[in-house]
Amino acid sequence: MSQAIMKQAEERMEKAHLSLKKELATLRAGRANVSILDPVQVDYYGSPTPLNQVANVNTPEARLILITPWDKSMVTEIEKAIQRADLGLAPSSDGTVIRLAIPPLTEDRRKELVKLVKKYTEEGKVALRNIRRDTNEQLKKQEKDGVLTEDDLRGYTEDVQTLTDKFVKVLDQTAADKEQEIMEV
């Protein structure tokens, strides 16, 4: 039972890490990355549809994203969707494909992005602390119900703290990697 609680805590912490990675992937770091277009929803015959379901999206060059719609009549709709998403990118089209040139980041914008990275990382750490608190409460309840001894509870509580420390380091490393990517000129 207690092992199941520990396993659940580890899975939840891994999800918090994956959530941070996904959040950081949407930050534009000066290099073309198709994941910055993840929030773009295209009005496809009346229903909002993710961009990657109506077009082929790839990066032929370091600072260029090429969007090739499968239905050529969707070109203007895709352009509008990109502008509505407010990504700070100006789409240019030749009627069949859409090009998104990724401008180099200014120093001020880099600093703003690093602040965002820190904010997202802190949110991830708060999630980890909440998971730790929930797990410790579940373990204390088991001790109160007589399932765990006081010594077992202490051991599991230390294990939860070790697990939390491990994931805090993972989050910090993920953030440091993203900050380095952003600050690269």
Curated annotation (Swiss-Prot):
| CC annotations in GO | cytoplasm
Q: Which InterPro entries match?
A: Ribosome_recyc_fac, Ribosome_recyc_fac_dom, RRF_sf
UniProt xrefs under Pfam families: RRF
Q: Where in the cell?
A: Cytoplasm
Recall the GO molecular function terms of this protein's record: ribosomal large subunit binding
Q: Is Zinc one of the keywords UniProt gives this record? A: no
What keywords are assigned to this protein?
A: Cytoplasm, Protein biosynthesis
Superkingdom, taxonomy of origin: Bacteria
One GO-annotated biological process of the protein = translational termination
Task: Return the similarity comment.
Answer: Belongs to the RRF family.
Which function does this protein serve? Responsible for the release of ribosomes from messenger RNA at the termination of protein biosynthesis. May increase the efficiency of translation by recycling ribosomes from one round of translation to another.
* Protein name in UniProt: Ribosome-recycling factor
Per the UniProt record, the source organism is Exiguobacterium sibiricum (strain DSM 17290 / CCUG 55495 / CIP 109462 / JCM 13490 / 255-15)
Upper lineage ranks?
Answer: Bacteria, Bacillati, Bacillota, Bacilli, Bacillales
Gene responsible for this protein: frr
